[in-house]
Amino acid sequence: MMTDELDTLLEWFDLKDELRTGWVLRNIDSPESVAAHTWGTASLCLLYAEQEEIDRQKAVTMALIHDLGEARTGDIATRAEEGRQTTPTSEKEAAERSAVTDLVGPFNDTELLALWEEYEARDTPTAQFVKDMDLIDNCLQALKYERQTRYDEAEANDHFAEFENLDEFFATAAPRLRTAFGQNLFEQIKSQYERELGRPCQL
């Protein structure tokens, strides 16, 4: 193993320590890392890809690298309210593309870079499926945190002034889902979230 490969591997592993910004802003106790989210997304692909006639290996591989760039850029959260988006989408995409290119470079694996580009374009059924599983993972995590009472509901939080509880994570996901399967999963998770809260989720 060359030195640049070792150094790059260690940078990949930074995802294990990079906390998911949305949960941090919501003051979730011990929030998940980007790597934990990646595992959740890959697991959903593993379980459901073939059911949706998607190549399982390709989907899982795409899921494993979909947030790789955040090892260098950090996790830039997508917000439901446009005015709360701190970094323009184009700037975020450019930074992540540069990071992924650098992080894959030492391994000379053009297939991984191509899969990441395919994911970002969202033009193929596989990319749309994986993106939906990325969003579904977030909704599942919101339901899990709500059940575990991992935040102080009564605490004033300027970052989430427009939404109660963890509604914003559902509101962020809802308009971005592209597949019927993803939308169906979303409705099931949201319905359970609503039953447990005893009120409709604000979207």
Show where each model-derived region lies.
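Alpha-helical, largely C-terminal catalytic domains
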Residues: 1-203
